[in-house]
Amino acid sequence: MSLSDKDKAAVKALWSKIAKSADVIGNDAVSRMIVVYPQTKTYFAHWPDLTPGSTNIKAHGKKVMGGIALAVSKIDDLKAGLSDLSEQHAFKLRVDPANFKILNHCIMVVISSMFPKDFTPEAHISLDKFLSAVALALAEKYR
């Protein structure tokens, strides 16, 4: 699935509005993922505290949203722009790529609840396509 110029512009416009809240979005999205999809806890078993908003959850949420920020900046070539992250998730972290879709959904739920006026139907579809493209780029090294 490729992103149209309209999709790219919509993602960049939405990101410009939400970027300053990225850490909160990341914390809430990772917290939501851990609670709603408890099978994802297996990747974080080494953390002493998996409760929503814990120090580890906040730190990981910040990393996740840093990756999203990187993806927005590399939106014209996500495969190359996210190559290092793909390699890390495939070979070091060994994350099942199906979990990218789960986290993407949680990110969209949080953004839609925090920014309801900005999360228009057009922004929704463009962000969904973008996050799907990010997940595909992150899964690249699994092949």
UniProtKB/Swiss-Prot annotation:
Tissue: Red blood cells.
Assigned keywords, A-Z: Acetylation, Heme, Iron, Metal-binding, Oxygen transport, Transport
Protein name as catalogued: Hemoglobin subunit alpha
Source organism: Artedidraco orianae (Barbeled plunderfish)
Residues annotated to bind heme b: 89
Sequence intervals crossing the membrane: none
GO cellular component, one term: hemoglobin complex
Family stated for the protein in its record: Belongs to the globin family.
Signal peptide segment: none
In-chain residues carrying the UniProt-annotated modification N-acetylserine: 2
Subunit comment: Heterotetramer of two alpha chains and two beta chains.
Cited Pfam families: Globin
GO MF annotations, alphabetized: haptoglobin binding; heme binding; iron ion binding; organic acid binding; oxygen binding; oxygen carrier activity; peroxidase activity
Highest taxon in the source lineage: Eukaryota
Single biological process term from Gene Ontology: hydrogen peroxide catabolic process
